[in-house]
């Protein structure tokens, strides 16, 4: 008996490997040939499902965006649980910074937005989501300043292969959000 075809499963497999390839090796590394190789499908399948390389990239980025949106929801719950305290936020963000693949995925969204302006809304979602969740614990301006700082910390971590010092992170978050730390912090 011939195995049943699963066009949507095949398309999804190609998108999953395309997203991972861009995260691992950059926007430019993605080709129809590379996706076919990684997904173990004929080259013609990639051009059948995706009219152009831009179509493939954009569709794969939507996978990354969906994952980022889910992470934002999880982070929002954790921020709420720590009541937006600088100590809690710093601990939460240090955990976030420990996942290099996640940081690279976020950076991919920024790079995509720089390369193709129509993709900027994908990248802007993280900063907007972070600002919104922090606005419950600080002024809108302080929340935005903190979100922008945290964004810079992500780039620092990627460039230096290590996160910032947690104490320095706590102090910066407290200063930006206009709150104070306990004396021993």
Predicted region positions:
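Short alpha-helical scaffolding segments that buttress acidic/His motifs in well-ordered protein cores
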Residues: 92-93, 106-110, 146, 150-153
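Hydrophobic/aromatic-rich alpha-helical bundle segments in the mid-to-C-terminal region
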Residues: 119-120, 124, 128, 137-185
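Helix-turn-helix
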Residues: 13, 17-55, 59
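Short, basic, alpha-helical segments at the C-terminal edge of helix-turn-helix-like DNA-binding modules
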Residues: 62-67
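N-terminal intrinsically disordered/low-complexity leader segments
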Residues: 1-9, 181-185
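Hydrophobic alpha-helical connector segments
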Residues: 70-103
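Short loop-to-helix capping motifs
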Residues: 115-117
